[in-house]
């Protein structure tokens, strides 16, 4: 490695994930040296609570690193090497509607899947495109690592609208599952695994998992998942109830195709009736997040600020943050590390549309992602992927063309919506709810 130090901007500085990312950057500062750390958010008040706590963290652990929090795009995006984008357009108020409106109609209400994911996607596209434009204007040589949801729709939009931008779309969900896999087979973490995986974001399958010696771990993993899903028993005692349910339900998703291991989000598409029956339309995942994660993170920020020290902080590194830092390091030092990303298919999955934005292993280096070939999708997976990818493309069509019909088609095609009349009822309600965020549909 050389003597370079990097300037990093976290766009969406008020996110509850920000302290974990900061802590991870500081923990890995020998591997990925920093000269400057900046936060950017359009909600200055929310960001400031996080920033004041994180500034204490930075000053105590790496006083040589310059720290800045701002709501000014020019100040934020000037002189940066990496932008970590984690915005939520409409905040939790809109996420709550994304979940609760479909549930009123007996349809899965979820942040990134189904009608809720489509609604969120339409809000997110201009927000992420705006960040890309700021980066290209003020730091044209920077890389953006985008993990703003819904990643699949955002990735399709950036492919079309900013095809030459230095943006890498990523998601931490498979990473978290792989850490669980490592625990199931008694390994330290996901970095001890060598894997093959393919699909769309929140919509994929592992076809092979091995350790570094080449030992096939699939038989042991399948035996465990068939009985327990990805639930880790006593190790999950502090895990939120909705996630425990999701990890356990992976056993039923696995049963549909015992030749692979599934992403947990497939439960929404394959068992929507079960999901709706086990949902409370008056208390959804948003309410759980606000009661648990939001409260915990902001209480801890306030405690650090009041104490004037972060020496005894409860914040810690997590899958989400470690993955992002590993990716920055791979690009900065051209390591060719193998990691998952959402990229144009271009033959990676042989029998899927070459323009589809697929999630596959890539080698990361100074020029970004080099996708690896995963062969052909099986018939079951091919059918699911093709349908869902068309939903994502129609959503971006709707944005580009400001088309009500395209958005209705997207919701009608979505596997978890029973028919076009229900899709229209949900859509009409969502048009009103999103009037301040969506383009005016014709």
UniProtKB/Swiss-Prot annotation:
Catalytic activity line of the entry: alpha-maltose 6'-phosphate + H2O = D-glucose 6-phosphate + D-glucose
Residues binding NAD(+): 6-72
A Pfam family the protein falls into: Glyco_hydro_4C
GO molecular function annotation: maltose-6'-phosphate glucosidase activity; metal ion binding; oxidoreductase activity, acting on the CH-OH group of donors, NAD or NADP as acceptor
SUPFAM superfamilies associated with the record: LDH C-terminal domain-like, NAD(P)-binding Rossmann-fold domains
Signal sequence coordinates: none
Cofactor: Mn(2+); Co(2+); Ni(2+); Fe(2+)
Enzyme class: hydrolase
Key words of the record: Carbohydrate metabolism, Cobalt, Glycosidase, Hydrolase, Iron, Manganese, Metal-binding, NAD, Nickel
Record's note on what induces expression: By maltulose, leucrose and palatinose, but not by maltose, glucose or sucrose.
Coiled-coil region(s): none
Residue numbers binding substrate: 95, 149, 285
Regulation of this protein's activity per its record: Is inhibited by EDTA in vitro.
GO-annotated biological processes: carbohydrate metabolic process
EC nos: 3.2.1.122
Residues binding Mn(2+), per UniProt: 171, 202
This protein's record includes keyword NAD: yes
Catalytic-site annotation from UniProt: 172, 265
Record Gene3D superfamilies: Lactate dehydrogenase/glycoside hydrolase, family 4, C-terminal, NAD(P)-binding Rossmann-like Domain
Site (Increases basicity of active site Tyr): 111
InterPro entries found in the cross-reference section: GlycHydrolase_4_CS, Glyco_hydro_4, Glyco_hydro_4_C, Lactate_DH/Glyco_Ohase_4_C, NAD(P)-bd_dom_sf
Cofactor note: Binds 1 divalent metal ion per subunit. Mn(2+) is the most efficient metal, but can also use Co(2+), Ni(2+) and Fe(2+), and to a lesser extent Mg(2+). Cannot use Zn(2+).
Family label: Belongs to the glycosyl hydrolase 4 family.
Binding partners and assembly: Homodimer. May also form homotetramer.
Record's protein name: 6-phospho-alpha-glucosidase 1
Organism for this UniProt entry: Lacticaseibacillus paracasei (strain ATCC 334 / BCRC 17002 / CCUG 31169 / CIP 107868 / KCTC 3260 / NRRL B-441)
Lineage start: Bacteria, Bacillati, Bacillota, Bacilli, Lactobacillales
């Amino acid at each position: 490695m050389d003597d370079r130090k990097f300037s990093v901007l976290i766009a969406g500085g008020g996110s509850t994930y920000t302290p974990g990312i900061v802590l991870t950057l500081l923990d890995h500062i020998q591997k990925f040296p920093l000269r400057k750390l900046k936060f950017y958010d359009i909600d200055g008040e929310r960001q400031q609570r996080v920033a004041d706590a994180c500034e204490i963290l930075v000053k105590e652990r790496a006083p040589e690193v310059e720290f800045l929090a701002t709501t000014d795009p020019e100040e934020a995006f000037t002189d940066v090497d990496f932008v970590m984008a984690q915005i939520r357009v409409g905040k939790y108020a809109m996420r709550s509607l994304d979940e609760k409106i479909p549930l009123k109609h007996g349809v899965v209400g979820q942040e990134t899947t189904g009608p809720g994911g489509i609604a969120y996607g339409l809000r997110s596209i201009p927000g992420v495109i705006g960040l890309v434009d700021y980066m290209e204007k003020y730091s044209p040589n920077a890389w953006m690592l985008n993990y703003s949801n819904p990643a699949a729709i955002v990735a399709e939009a950036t492919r079309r609208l900013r095809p030459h931008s230095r943006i890498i779309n990523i998601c931490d969900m498979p990473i978290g599952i792989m850490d669980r896999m490592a625990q199931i087979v008694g390994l330290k973490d996901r970095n001890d695994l060598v894997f093959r995986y393919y699909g769309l974001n929140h919509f994929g399958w592992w076809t092979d998992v091995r350790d570094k010696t080449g030992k096939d771990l699939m038989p042991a993993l399948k035996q465990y998942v068939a009985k327990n899903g990805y639930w880790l028993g006593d190790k999950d005692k502090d895990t939120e109830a909705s996630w425990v349910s999701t990890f356990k339900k992976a056993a039923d998703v696995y049963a549909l195709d015992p030749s692979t291991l599934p992403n947990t989000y497939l439960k929404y598409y394959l068992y929507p009736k079960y999901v709706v029956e086990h949902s409370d339309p008056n208390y959804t995942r948003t309410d759980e997040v606000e009661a648990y994660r939001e409260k915990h993170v902001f209480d801890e920020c306030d405690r650090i600020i009041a104490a004037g020290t972060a020496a005894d902080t409860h914040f810690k590194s997590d899958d989400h943050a470690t993955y992002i830092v590993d990716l920055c390091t791979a690009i900065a030092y051209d390591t060719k590390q193998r990691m998952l990303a959402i990229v144009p298919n271009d033959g990676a999955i042989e029998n899927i549309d070459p323009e589809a934005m697929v999630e596959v292993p890539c080698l990361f280096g100074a020029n970004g992602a080099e996708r690896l070939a995963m062969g052909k999708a099986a018939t079951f997976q091919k059918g699911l992927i093709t349908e869902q990818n068309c939903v994502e493309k129609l959503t971006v069509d709707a944005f580009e063309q400001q088309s009500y019909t395209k958005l209705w088609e997207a919701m009608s095609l979505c596997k978890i919506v029973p028919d076009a009349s229900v899709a229209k009822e949900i859509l009409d309600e969502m048009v009103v709810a999103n009037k301040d965020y969506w383009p005016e549909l014709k």
